[in-house]
UniProtKB/Swiss-Prot annotation:
Its cofactor is Mg(2+). This is Serine/threonine-protein kinase PAK 1. Its EC number is 2.7.11.1. Changing residue 84 to A: Constitutively active. Residues 75-88 form the CRIB domain. SUPFAM superfamilies: Protein kinase-like (PK-like). The modification Phosphotyrosine is found at residues 131, 142, 153, 200, 284. Residues 68-79 have a biased composition (Basic and acidic residues). Changing residue 144 to A: Decreases activity. It catalyses: L-seryl-[protein] + ATP = O-phospho-L-seryl-[protein] + ADP + H(+); L-threonyl-[protein] + ATP = O-phospho-L-threonyl-[protein] + ADP + H(+). Keywords: Acetylation, Allosteric enzyme, Apoptosis, ATP-binding, Cell junction, Cell membrane, Cell projection, Chromosome, Cytoplasm, Cytoskeleton, Exocytosis, Kinase, Membrane, Nucleotide-binding, Nucleus, Phosphoprotein, Serine/threonine-protein kinase, Transferase. The modification N-acetylserine is found at residue 2.
Amino acid sequence: MSNNGLDVQDKPPAPPMRNTSTMIGAGSKDPGTLNHGSKPLPPNPEEKKKKDRFYRSILAGDKTNKKKEKERPEISLPSDFEHTIHVGFDAVTGEFTGMPEQWARLLQTSNITKSEQKKNPQAVLDVLEFYNSKKTSNSQKYMSFTDKSAEDYNSSNTLNVKTVSETPAVPPVSEDEDDDDDATPPPVIAPRPEHTKSVYTRSVIEPLPVTPTRDVATSPISPTENNTTPPDALTRNTEKQKKKPKMSDEEILEKLRSIVSVGDPKKKYTRFEKIGQGASGTVYTAMDVATGQEVAIKQMNLQQQPKKELIINEILVMRENKNPNIVNYLDSYLVGDELWVVMEYLAGGSLTDVVTETCMDEGQIAAVCRECLQALEFLHSNQVIHRDIKSDNILLGMDGSVKLTDFGFCAQITPEQSKRSTMVGTPYWMAPEVVTRKAYGPKVDIWSLGIMAIEMIEGEPPYLNENPLRALYLIATNGTPELQNPEKLSAIFRDFLNRCLEMDVEKRGSAKELLQHQFLKIAKPLSSLTPLIAAAKEATKNNH
């Protein structure tokens, strides 16, 4: 990674700026901003059953690493609980039957047309259940681990679809369901943040309507007397894990004492400056007295942390996974009832500011993609899936350095977004296999990287201004999103995007493979990002 700064004497021309900011709240009704949703929907891509299955575990971690396994609490496999929802779909009338009332209300306001519902009722139910599961899951993030020893784990969860004559048959799909509290859910994607005066961002998208809880159950639908053919029977069986006894507060404190550093952080760090405040803690920048390094410190009141057990796991994992392209965990301390976590600090802000305020050329985009792929190759080789790749989670140094953040415990270093606990962020960057609740692996990060590359081209991801549920539907059914002006891109860049945004997971490139792609060979030095960072910071300052 290059850290070369610009020669102050060679003043480059001002970087190209976007004419208007593309950041629009979710409530925007301007039809001119709907760039992606109006195109006709292609046929639902044929789903190929994956050979490799990734079993996801929060606390058990990578079972191939015995040392980590010993240090992390274990969670049992799902067992002895079955929850069934029966929903019917009449392909003649195009109406769902037996749908929970809250789901029906959500669907009514989703902007998913009747013809779209009739074309793919399965996708409609997939996104409704996905949205519902994210509404009920805890908003705190944690890393996902792939477990090679469990690739052949077969869940008994199935989704069976029977169709009437007017609708082509959809094959049964086997999927891995998640427990809201203990199993690793797909990532909850935060909404596009507003500009703020620091690298830390806050939510702007309003909370969505209330969805039905996971425990909503309906009776199986009986065929109505006046129907000549029964409605489609869409039956979802879900399992829930048995809960293991949680660690007591004293046990958690005892474990934390064995992990954190001994000593007074107020003597090691000086020049504290508050830069963020959240429900669970306060974020400061500070200076390491010994090295002069600027750091970010989050001070968290442990009594206000809903999942204290996860904190232990994340510190252990962060301590063991360090990389030049990751915003790294540096240290931690117990100060009274507070846990202080020290992380690297990057003063350049997030990539979001750059993509929304300036125009990047292909060489600069290639440089960012290369740095992100280096971080992903490292994480994936250590059986860690980031699950939340987007411009908001890429931080920049003033020298142009590019680092991935907001994975694992890094999620806790950002001030909590005020609405995150009461809403589900729209997953613009999320891979189709996640939205449709299939088993997934590290390549979900590659899809998200492809969407982030579109951000760098167009200033925003596809479907940003769509209703959240419709955005989910389009991700599940549209396949690879279309670019606004694909003819303006080079052939090698288009090929790189196609490799990232391949619907067939087995054909999608891995981080290791994509690091060899020809597109990355045109990458400019990282110092070429410095003028863009400076221009974005100036534009952000002028907007307030």
